[in-house]
Amino acid sequence: MSQQVIIFDTTLRDGEQALQASLSVKEKLQIALALERMGVDVMEVGFPVSSPGDFESVQTIARQVKNSRVCALARCVEKDIDVAAESLKVAEAFRIHTFIATSPMHIATKLRSTLDEVIERAIYMVKRARNYTDDVEFSCEDAGRTPIADLARVVEAAINAGATTINIPDTVGYTMPFEFAGIISGLYERVPNIDKAIISVHTHDDLGLAVGNSLAAVHAGARQVEGAMNGIGERAGNCSLEEVIMAIKVRKDILNVHTAINHQEIWRTSQLVSQICNMPIPANKAIVGSGAFAHSSGIHQDGVLKNRENYEIMTPESIGLNQIQLNLTSRSGRAAVKHRMDEMGYKESEYNLDNLYDAFLKLADKKGQVFDYDLEALAFIGKQQEEPEHFRLDYFSVQSGSNDIATAAVKLACGEEVKAEVANGNGPVDAVYQAINRITDYNVELVKYSLTAKGHGKDALGQVDIVANYNGRRFHGVGLATDIVESSAKAMVHVLNNIWRAAEVEKELQRKAQHNENNKETV
């Protein structure tokens, strides 16, 4: 009988570590809701003790996500576990994931400890986590380079202490699939109480083997796979969840397992993660790349036309990549837009219908027809600019030519005041940025600029993603418009608002800290 493999998503924790700029709470919530809609069993959404921002994101997601188990990471440190529990307690049920290194190298050089001390610490911390929840995951960091006898000792002790999931990470992407399968098999042979926990795997792609290692582990008995959408993560990335999920579906004949994933949401979730994280998907990426279902060879094209199964082991429709519909125009009403969003699986609570419809009408007047991908871009990329604003683009105008110096005039609303500046630059975008810098006096340093067409043809929406440095921190901004210069200006204004919000959060934290200090003095 087919057994279920639990899908544990760590896009918002391990995946986010690879990003050039941190995501906002609202951006993380958007991704979390998409993952919930896709049907992931568990989502690891942050490391609460690491920062107030991470704590807030975990708490916000734990409060709103209902159909997936929300999890937070904690080292084998008392404060980590206590803070993780505090951030998660708003959820009806939650998981705490705690970890400690087990390989001889890590124990000796990083922890400066012994295996016996590591086991003792693991037991204590698992028991501490169990005081808060009956769902505790324990990870043996660098398990791939841990002798099997040592690993078995740690695993047995953690299960006895109350761990309900034991995670075996290939932390540095070192093992071969046959080796990794051997580790899982070895644990089943050596750990007497292994039937009391679910065995999980967490692989990295340093040698390009993350998916292969995860599937080999599943074949050997692992029943949870951890990974990130699009394989994002530190260094070469994490195990690509969409690849593992579809491999399990397509090769059920060999693996004899299944997942609870809604496969129709894979493509949409992948695209959303790519857009929000500002990480384009390579065209040749398995499952979700733009070329994944493209056939350019004449022989292949002929074979596909005769029977798609000649060269396709799965269909675009199986991951939710359906034919684009041309059913919305400037004459479409608000109800029609809502109906189309409903058909695509989006809840009204995930977007602002009034704002979406206003943006839709403006775009429809310019383009004539509005596609599904246009609606998604307006609803979710545009949504990032709907957060409370201190800065707002009021007006811009540029003059440039092949032999002229680019000049930009910009009006920016700064709180209640509207300010204007004119500046020259190396091209129209640079001129606009110079004018904005003069208005705000922030003097941000542009680190990355990318432009992506959202749609097809000359009237496609242009999405500009930028990363900028300010006071030693990196901030991400996104802008969306049919005009590239306007998209660029909106992206910079988004960065400025993110900087302003970060400063406001810092002020609030300082205010609370001072308030607590005053209360202590009073007592």
UniProtKB/Swiss-Prot annotation:
Q: Which cysteines are joined by disulfide bonds?
A: none
PANTHER family to which the protein is assigned, alphabetical: 2-ISOPROPYLMALATE SYNTHASE 1, CHLOROPLASTIC-RELATED, HOMOCITRATE SYNTHASE-RELATED
Q: What is its EC number?
A: 2.3.3.13
UniProt keywords (A-Z) are: Amino-acid biosynthesis, Branched-chain amino acid biosynthesis, Cytoplasm, Leucine biosynthesis, Manganese, Metal-binding, Transferase
Q: Which family does it belong to?
A: Belongs to the alpha-IPM synthase/homocitrate synthase family. LeuA type 1 subfamily.
Give any Pfam family that matches: HCS_D2
> Would I find Manganese among this entry's keywords?
yes
The protein's required cofactor(s) are namely:
Mn(2+)
Chain intervals for the UniProt region annotation (Regulatory domain): 392-523
Q: Where's it found, cell-wise?
A: Cytoplasm
Source organism per UniProt: Escherichia coli O127:H6 (strain E2348/69 / EPEC)
Q: What is this protein called?
A: 2-isopropylmalate synthase
- What biological process terms from GO does the record include? L-leucine biosynthetic process
